[in-house]
UniProtKB/Swiss-Prot annotation:
Entries under PANTHER family matching the protein: PROTEIN ABHD11 (PTHR46118:SF4)
Residues forming coiled coils: none
Record's keyword terms, sorted: Hydrolase, Serine esterase
SUPFAM superfamilies documented for this protein: alpha/beta-Hydrolases (SSF53474)
Organism: Escherichia coli (strain K12)
Protein name: Esterase YbfF
Enzyme class at the top of the EC tree: hydrolase
Source organism, top-level taxon: Bacteria
InterPro entries given in the database record: AB_hydrolase_1, AB_hydrolase_fold
Gene Ontology cellular component annotations, sorted alphabetically: cytosol
Function: Displays esterase activity toward palmitoyl-CoA, malonyl-CoA and pNP-butyrate.
Family: Belongs to the DmpD/TodF/XylF esterase family.
Molecular function terms, GO-annotated: carboxylesterase activity; thiolester hydrolase activity
Length: 254
């Protein structure tokens, strides 16, 4: 599946590989914009809407092999042989899955606050309840939707993040498929070891990349290095963009 993208040309001359930015669950291509705005200085940038998100096509399947194939199809459509991939959460898993499908298309890999594991946890049921409450109402504006969502969610930052995908009274993500396929999204099928340097950027306050996942991570990414961002939660890049960009640039320049 060819994904909806936003492509930007680097502002300065360079020999760097293009960077593909891959968002997480309930997101869109805007979500890693804080990284794009810096990295476009010396890299061509592709931001993607993942399947069933934003303006990309809808499909009943939402697993990581399918998402990885979408990334290959999108590279092909842009006539890009090889790229650096930076993915957050679900997007990070999609990028990791790409190592098993088409490792020759990857220059470098960055996974932000995610590990290659099956989490076996439902962390988003309250979010689904809030989203469905808006869908069942006659809310047309983000202000109306926010009032409904506050009955289900306490974190204003999460509400505002979700509302970026509420346009003209409609959600831009495919709620029924995301609900149906949720076990695949939190899940993971182990992949063969990818024996190249990869950067993992966990948030110090996030449960997504804890010590219990270390062995699984190193079995699949034996040359992984982690740069923990102290004081950050799951949305590391939004909370501590400068620290995340420093870690990414150090890795890209090695």
């Amino acid at each position: 599946m060819k994904l909806n993208i936003r492509a930007q040309t680097a502002q300065n001359q360079h020999n760097n590989s293009p960077i593909v930015l891959v968002h997480g669950l309930f997101g869109s291509l805007d979500n890693l914009g804080v990284l794009a705005r810096d990295l476009v200085n010396d890299h061509n940038i592709i931001q993607v809407d993942m399947r069933n998100h934003g303006l990309s096509p809808r499909d009943p399947v939402m697993n990581y092999p399918a998402m990885a194939q979408d990334l290959v199809d999108t590279l092909d459509a842009q006539q890009i042989d090889k790229a650096t991939f930076i993915g957050h959460s679900m997007g990070g898993k999609a990028v990791m899955a790409l190592t098993a499908l088409a490792s020759d298309r990857i220059d470098k890999l960055v996974a932000i606050d995610i590990a290659p594991v099956d989490y076996h946890v439902r962390r988003h049921d309250e979010i689904f309840a809030a989203i469905n409450a808006v869908s069942e109402s006659d809310a047309q504006t983000r202000q109306q939707a926010a009032a409904i969502m506050r009955q289900h969610l306490n974190e204003e930052g999460v509400i505002q993040f979700l509302l970026k995908s509420f346009v003209d009274g409609e959600w831009r993500f495919n709620v029924p498929v995301l609900w149906d396929q949720y076990p695949h999204i939190v899940g993971w099928e182990k992949i063969p070891a990818w024996d190249h340097p990869a950067l993992f950027i966990p948030g110090g306050n996030s449960p997504y990349v804890s010590e219990q996942y270390r062995d699984d991570l190193l079995a699949q990414f034996p040359q992984a290095r982690a740069h923990v961002i102290a004081g950050a939660g799951h949305w590391v890049h939004a909370e501590k963009p400068d620290a995340v960009l420093r870690a990414i640039r150090r890795y890209l320049n090695d």
